[in-house]
Design a protein with these regions (language model features):
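Short, hydrophobic beta-strand segments
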Residues: 122-129, 134-144
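Short structured motifs
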Residues: 55-60, 117-124, 137-138
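Solvent-exposed serine/threonine-rich low-complexity stretches and specific carbohydrate-binding patches
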Residues: 105-110, 118-126
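Bacterial N-terminal signal peptides that target proteins for export
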Residues: 2-16
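Acidic/polar, low-complexity intrinsically disordered N-terminal segments immediately downstream
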Residues: 3-7, 30-113, 131, 143-154, ...
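C-terminal motif of bacterial Sec signal peptides marking the signal peptidase cleavage site
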Residues: 24-28
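Hydrophobic helical h-region of N-terminal Sec-dependent signal peptides
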Residues: 17-22
Length: 178
């Protein structure tokens, strides 16, 4: 019996000591070091999250038959949510589309305004929240399905109550699929 207790104690120490070593050596990763960045003093700004994920480029979407909706989100970016509302005005930006075509050798065509409707372009992100959106409804039956035409619906943040980030141009590539 005494031999079993010694054996169990030996096994416990052979497992416990390496575990303690790992625990204390890994915990050093949690300490602040010279490469720690303090974001607590960064100010708030607004952006289009989908534009940020796609570097202000074309985001292709294929819609089926019928009427389809698409939210264009505006994000209030900050270390913590604000205690006041943030306003933003979103607009259709033909100048950005033209500049994009010229700079990239593309020939995207502005989606005719008769092919979609949108909720208000004047957005308010309530205090304590991060997002608001323009809901775009595409009338798929009106969109020309000619494969030689590439339609784009270009959005931009025209103005906002907080600074506007560089991710403020969203170009939705609209195609009609099966």
């Amino acid at each position: 019996m005494e031999k079993n207790i010694k054996s169990i104690t030996k096994v416990r120490w052979t497992v416990l000591l390496p575990m303690l070593f790992i625990l204390f050596s890994v915990s050093s990763c949690l300490k602040n070091g010279p490469y720690n960045i303090d974001f607590s003093n960064v100010g708030a700004s607004v952006d289009l999250p989908l534009a940020a994920a796609n570097a202000n480029g074309v985001v292709p979407f294929t819609f089926g038959t019928g009427s389809n909706t698409f939210p264009v989100y505006v994000n209030m970016a900050s270390p913590a949510v604000l205690s006041k509302a943030t306003t933003a005005v979103v607009a259709i930006d033909t100048a950005y589309l033209n500049a994009y075509n010229a700079n990239n050798g593309t020939s995207y065509t502005l989606l005719p305004d008769s092919d979609y409707t949108a909720t208000s372009f004047n957005l308010t992100i309530p205090a304590g929240q991060r997002l608001d959106s323009v809901i775009v409804t595409f009338n798929i039956s009106k969109i020309d399905t000619d494969p030689s035409v590439s339609y784009i619906l270009p959005f931009t943040i025209a103005s906002a109550s907080e600074p506007i980030e560089q991710w403020n141009h969203l170009m939705i590539g609209v195609t009609v699929g099966p």
